[in-house]
Amino acid sequence: MVFGMNLGNRRKATRVPDLSRYDYHYNGSGGNSVNQGDNYLKSHELSADAAFAASARAGSLVNYPERGYTNISRANSLRMGHPGQQQQQSSYIPRSYSFTARGAYAPRTGNVGNRRSVSAIPRTGTASSRGVGSRTGSMTGSVARVGSRTGSFAGGGNGSIIIKTQEVKDMMGRTQSITTQTIRRINGMEYVETTTQTAGLVEDPQFHFQQFAENDEFPISDELSATPPAAPLSESQPRTNQRLANFNSNAINNSAANNIRSDSEEEGEEHFTDASDVVEESGAFAEDDQDHFLAKVNKVDVDNNSKSYTSRKPLVQKQGVQQQQEVQHQGISQVQNTEAKSVGRKSTMSKRMTLRDTPNAQLEPEKDTTDQATPDNNATKRKSIFKSKKRNEAVAVPTVPTSDQKTLSQEEMYAIALEIAQQKYGHPTKTVSHSTDNGSRNEMTPILEDADVEQPHVLPTTLHLPTREEQIQHEQLQQPTAAIPTNEKSRHPKKKVKSILDRVVQFSQENSGNQPPKQHRGKQYSQQPPDVAPSNGTTDNFDTNASGHNINHNNNNHNNNNNTSSSSSLRHESGANPVVVTEDTTVLAASTAATPVDVNEPGNPDHVIPASSPSIDNTPRINEKTKSKKKNEKGSFFKRLFKSNKTHINTK
């Protein structure tokens, strides 16, 4: 504790400033009060020179005028001055020091000057007793620059007058205020008079922050604060002034901002002169443009949109009506031409099936033997549908006129189906004409060798060997997938070719009667299973097992087993119709040249029918019961066709 107290005492002793070394400037030795006057006389020369140098160094300051200033405030004070209190007495300005001129140097101190130094008022008893006046300049340490000018007038006796002027400037160098302080010493008393003059209006500190917060829209408003007010505004502009009053607290700034805003609004209205006329005609808004400016713009937009809609509406309606008429026309033609479209569907289902290439010259006999009831333009349309070999392109279905639909018979439809299949793949069969027609063939029985349906092709009751052309033709159409010795080599698989021709023959046999409407076919699709083979009391029944060899013929109660490698075999009985037997599977054998199938003459080697040669019924056996059953079985043909194709694909 003692050690700490001793340290504290030592610190206090060192912190006390020792001003004794400055006493020789004022009091000489500074220690003896008796010799104080003599010692002071020894050092007055140095102090006078220092004061003069300080006043001469600040002579470049500009004297500012003192006119035209308002808000003058004065303060008077009376103080007593005692000798020996220079360092202990504090003036009204902190950090003040005094310099006093004495003796012979009194006339020199009468000059007026400015200096930049921290100075105070000289207060010494000796100066007042000797009647010496001093004149110095001062400057206080503040945020802004302060220039001061002090004038002293020496009087007789104990009287002296000291005048000090302070000038405050801002950072831009503009004068903000001028303070004049007059000190009179009369009989040891000091009279202090202070006068302050301001250069202009003092800005509100709150408004200083408003220019950064609310008045960002008009950055030049601060510079326009000293400008005179603008001309009086019109009657419509005071309302805008009220709207902008919340942004500015100064009336001058508000007027300048309103002038800028009004000019921008007038420029904007020039673009909407035509719009304002429209709104005035409607009578929905007042005549004041600035109050309803935004409402006008919105109203004009709505009117323009409505006008554009009304002008474009008739065009849209016309186009819509035309499109609806076209759609309705197409819909009516599609409903009325269901048979023609079904033919098109049949052709698209067999896109993956190809036929062997044959000469294109074989197409020419078809033109001469086409049905006369069907117009030529329809036939050409049907031919042109499938000329393109691009499978990706959509095939347009021709629309048959309503007047020709009544003449389109079932026979024509089958002919079209065969013709489409031939034209699609470019492999038509050669036309073989026969003059023998005893009238025993059914009308609806198709002829595979003849593309013309109207030309009959009938085998005689006495079987004979087919011609070379027929044999070559049918071998081209039905070649097995394996390499079987034949007259001509096959380049395409047999199963796909066989499926087309077999289904056409079966379809012709099943659908010899009238076709039911299309809606009944859909019902029969679900009623008739696809696996059921057509069977009745008077027609042929085909029952093909898994291997495709056992065929049951129920016409005259004959049961025969026919194991061949061909896809079609002919079995003929005396007094009965030859039957075309279709098989879905193929059995490879060493030789398929011919197969004897004559039941009445089993040992006759002359009567041999080629395995690939189809035969057609000679006599019609169709009654009412047969027609009704064949109508029901007609719809399941395509299902069986698709299923048989899948079977071929699975058996590969």
Curated annotation (Swiss-Prot):
It is found in: Cell membrane. The keyword Cell membrane applies. Its main location: membrane. Residues 125-141, 337-361, 506-517, 524-544, 612-621 have a biased composition (Polar residues). Keywords: Cell membrane, DNA recombination, Meiosis, Membrane. This is Meiotic sister-chromatid recombination protein 3. The keyword Amino-acid biosynthesis does not apply. It is a peripheral membrane protein. Residues 316-336, 545-569 have a biased composition (Low complexity). Residues 123-151, 304-406, 470-576, 594-652 are annotated as: Disordered. One of its GO terms (cellular component) is plasma membrane. It comes from the Eukaryota. The lineage of its organism: Eukaryota, Fungi, Dikarya, Ascomycota, Saccharomycotina. Residues 380-390, 640-652 have a biased composition (Basic residues). May be involved in the control of meiotic sister-chromatid recombination. GO terms for biological process: DNA recombination; meiotic cell cycle.
